Amino acid sequence: GKIQSEKVVRGLKRPNNVDIEYGLKIGGKKVDIAVTTERMNHQLRIYSLPDMKPIDNGGIPMFEGETGTEFRDLMGIALYKNPKGKIYAMVGRKNGPTTGGYIWQYELSDNGKGQVKATFIRKFGTYSGKKEIESIAVDDALGYVYYSDEGVGVRKYYAEPSKGDQELALFATRGFSEDHEGISIYHTSARKGYILVSDQGANQFHIFPREGSAKNPHEHPELKVVKVEAKQSDGSDVTAVPLNKTFKKGLFVVMSDDKTFHYYSWEQIKKHLF
């Protein structure tokens, strides 16, 4: 791919993670958005797609009122669109409480002036205190949010606030060499697919069933480990949408620490599963 320099956003103070969502209603129109965490300014930045124009009135402060060391230093971000069309941001930070409430959830909406506002909804999520939490991923269709508690495992919660804050699962607790990092979700049908989790230090991904087991939807046994060429990957994404002749069943993109992105067809990943 080629960088579109006219759409590059510069001058942010340590942008950390990014996610996209479709159809946020602004000024009576549906707008696709890209949202990134700006760590050192303790705020979200929101841009319309595909033009990458800021629509956040200069930035939206996060974790207001928190005073602990690095408790406002933003890291992970994942967006969730519920069945009614409401869009939420799940936001993580460099450090946080070990007593619950590590992730804060905000509803994104029109402020009435053509810009986006964020309304605090809830805080949830266990943190081991061992390392940090960066990678967050949401399964819109099934209504779950997952995040990597580095060095511990992947934690699973309901994405919908009304369903409560209880932890549904802690999986991927064995076989990782160092940090648990990027989480990607591949759909094979409306309710089935795979969860891919980066084992950063080993340059590989552990793969788990999206739908859980036959007896328990919150039981995610490991299916396979797949090696990749990317080094120290802490970011990835996957789509099941057919893109072209090379990526007929989707594309898995993996970030490498040499500032490159590695592209894999889903067929390259799938051959290791069966």
Predicted regions and their residues:
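Asp-box/WD-like beta-propeller blade repeats and closely related beta-sheet repeat scaffolds
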Residues: 42-95
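Short loop/turn segments immediately following beta-strands, especially the blade-tip
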Residues: 1, 23-26, 46-56, 105-117, ...
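A short beta-strand motif characteristic of beta-propeller blades
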Residues: 2-11, 53-68, 117-127, 166-174, ...
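Blade-loop segments of beta-propeller domains
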Residues: 1-42, 61
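Structural signature of eukaryotic scaffold interfaces centered on beta-propeller domains
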Residues: 14-30, 71-87, 129-143, 181-191, ...
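Loop/turn-rich, solvent-exposed surfaces of beta-rich toroidal or solenoidal domains
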Residues: 175-221
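Conserved blade-ending motifs and adjacent loop-strand segments that build the rim/top face
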Residues: 8-11, 168-183, 215-243
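Blade-level signature of beta-propeller repeat domains, shared across WD40, Kelch, NHL, RCC1
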Residues: 234-274
